[in-house]
Amino acid sequence: MPNIVLSRIDERLIHGQVGVQWVGFAGANLVLVANDEVAKDQVQQNLMEMVLAEGIAVRFWPLQKVIDNIHRAADRQKILLVCKTPKDFLTLVNGDVPVTRINVGNMHYAEGKQQITKTVSVDDQDIVAFNGLKSAGVECFIQGVPTEQAQDLYKLL
């Protein structure tokens, strides 16, 4: 079973909060970005890699590759798994990726979205995905940085 130390939804994927604060807090030594678009975008990958400290490995995999390969992870790999959307995590969970808790970070406001906290806005598609995660027994909590108090996302929907 893969050693996933933290699963996080963050539209920015890897940035300062994730690359420094969450990696350190979780004790991760591998950041696995599960995103179909970024897996094909070397420029985005290079920018994200610059944020990570020396010694932290990173992989940029499409969702299906994560589903197909996550169970081959070595025990020594302490994985911080990050996706852009709850729909992506629902795809992973439905593909038997062992995710039981998701830290919800940045989901920015846009037309058609409802702001539920200062950093999290959701639309109907997000709510459907979160309800699917809830049905699968996945806990979802909002916490921007490790020093903030976590909030139960489901109570805010």
Describe these PLM feature segments:
Residues 3-7, 29-32, 57-59, 78-81, ...:
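Structural motif
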Residues 61-105:
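Ordered, amphipathic secondary-structure segments that act as subunit-interaction surfaces
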Residues 2-57:
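Long, hydrophobic N-terminal alpha-helical segment
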Residues 19-20, 89, 130:
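Generic hydrophobic/aromatic pocket-lining and core-packing "Φ" positions
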Residues 47-51, 55-59, 69-82, 115-121:
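Short basic, glycine-rich beta-strand/loop surfaces that mediate nucleic-acid
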Residues 35-38, 63-66, 86, 105-109, ...:
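Short, ordered loop/turn segments at secondary-structure junctions
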